[in-house]
């Protein structure tokens, strides 16, 4: 009986000590390579995502890998539409262990990105929590008005404010603070239902 209890306790300690490791990187293009990083206790999956920043006719694509939580894996596509004809969209995929070594690169499919008749107040401001709003037309499945205030963004500005249209999936990801692996910054995220232009 004692040996059985000892084995159970040993197994528990070993399980606790086995931390997940994920490759972490962020590079231009459709692939990226980085070093392995031990994930936090609450992070139980690795995630790879391809992101496209669009300001027609130009676009910029980069690929990222990091630790994440499995409760966000179903949020595999996110999109936002901002002022100045700026749009950002991303496709995500989760993996664990050897699966990450054989998983094909994430691919962002081409789509028409059509307007859906909904609108949100939008603005982009650096170095301030406020910015001059203008009406932004939403596209595709964007049905949320996003308001994001970031603090301690040392690599861009101390503070940043972003408002525009967003998908529900993007709101959920931002509210779960999934970007903690990239840097130590604070995000205040609020999302509200979009409104038709006729209501303005």
Curated annotation (Swiss-Prot):
> What GO molecular-function term can you cite, just one?
phospholipase A2 inhibitor activity
Where does it sit, as one GO cellular component term?
extracellular region
Function description = Inhibits the enzymatic activity of phospholipase A2 (PA2).
Q: What is this protein called?
A: Phospholipase A2 inhibitor gamma subunit B
Expression sites by tissue: Expressed by the liver.
Where would I find glycosylation on this chain? Answer: 33
What does the similarity note say? Belongs to the CNF-like-inhibitor family.
Q: List the disulfide bonds.
A: 22-46, 25-32, 39-67, 73-94, 95-100, 120-145, 138-165, 171-191
């Amino acid at each position: 009986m004692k040996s059985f209890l000892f084995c159970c306790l040993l197994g528990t300690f070993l399980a606790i000590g086995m931390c997940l490791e994920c490759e972490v990187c962020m590079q231009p293009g459709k692939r990226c390579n980085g070093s392995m990083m031990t994930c936090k206790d609450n992070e139980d999956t690795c995630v790879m995502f391809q992101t496209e920043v669009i300001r027609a006719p130009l676009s910029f694509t980069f690929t990222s890998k990091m630790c994440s939580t499995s409760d966000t894996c179903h949020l595999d596509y996110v999109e936002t539409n901002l002022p100045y004809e700026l749009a950002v969209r991303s496709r995500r995929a989760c993996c664990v262990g050897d699966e990450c070594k054989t998983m094909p690169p994430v691919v962002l499919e081409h789509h028409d990105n059509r307007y859906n008749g909904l609108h949100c107040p939008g603005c982009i401001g650096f170095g301030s929590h406020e910015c001059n709003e203008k009406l932004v037309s939403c596209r595709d499945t964007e049905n949320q008005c996003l308001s994001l205030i970031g603090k301690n963004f040392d690599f861009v500005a101390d503070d940043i404010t972003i408002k525009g249209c967003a998908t529900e999936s993007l709101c959920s990801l931002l509210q779960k603070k999934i970007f903690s692996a990239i840097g130590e910054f604070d995000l205040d995220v609020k999302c509200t239902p979009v409104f038709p232009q006729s209501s303005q």
